């Protein structure tokens, strides 16, 4: 038993070494909104966390990444939102609006909210946390024995 369900993803895993054992933290190169300049994230680590619902990072960086991305409460125009790409250890992982906008339907009403949030963790916090928003698109394999985490495109 390999520790993962092959019916839940396509392709092979792209593995990334854990750079900090305290968390599942991997090397973080850049993040970029399509059509804008890449943001250098080399001083930060990407934490892959199944216990976090969204993507959370330092407010100043999240504000820079999401500049110009406006999510209307009633989802108007979300299909025009740009892709966002995160680069971990030289490998790109792209999210579309379908990945980073939460759509919640209750009765006949669907409401939308951005699933990337800024938080002021403090001056010594050098992480960005990638929770379910990221992991819904990229099936994640936590390979504890080899101190690495792998990603493959999830099936839905």
Name each region found by the language model:
Residues 1-156:
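Active-site or ligand-binding cleft "flap/edge" segments
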